[in-house]
Amino acid sequence: MLIFFFIFFFLSFFIYFYFTNELFMYSYLQFFLNSQFFYYFIVSEVFFFGGVFWSLFWIIFSYDSCFFLSLSLISPFGLALFNTFLLLASSSFGCLFHVNYLNNIHDINLIFCILLGLLFLFNQFIEFNFCFYTISDFSFCSIFFFGTGFHGFHVFVGLVFLIFCFYSIFYVKYYFIFFINCSLLYWHFVDVIWLFLFNLVYIFIFFLYN
């Protein structure tokens, strides 16, 4: 069943970079060269979530399979898959907004980007409330809620940045290109982290023990 995990893993990243790579890579290249501080911040976040993924792998290969078979694992084909499509679509709208913004076109793509992010948080809240286990049940449950919950916090922070961008562009008429670039780059980083979480916490575990 692991073949399904690898199919979903590579397919999800292929879809993400196919729809976003050409839209924003050329503008972010110069941004990376001129903003080392924010680059280091993103790298530190990568190491943080790397610790979460390392803990997950340690639990997977340290516990007996009966441990996971005793859990009612969450299906990856429900809200988790829907949330993945939401973030992919939100990221695409963010890229379209950025390209149009560079051409002095102020459209509503940023609104769609924000609304899809809010819907993601709402669905995540619903999933937590109807989950079959709690954060204090097992070690895997703690990693599951910590990883997805902290990612949800990053989504919330990213939405705050995007809402401020929307407000400053359409109402204040005064904004910094650096802040817009940081906000959108942070949003894409949140999307990539979710792809790892979705493939490891949902797909990998589900197909490994079902």
Language-model segment annotations:
Residues 1-210:
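Core, highly hydrophobic multi-pass alpha-helical transmembrane subunits of bioenergetic inner membranes
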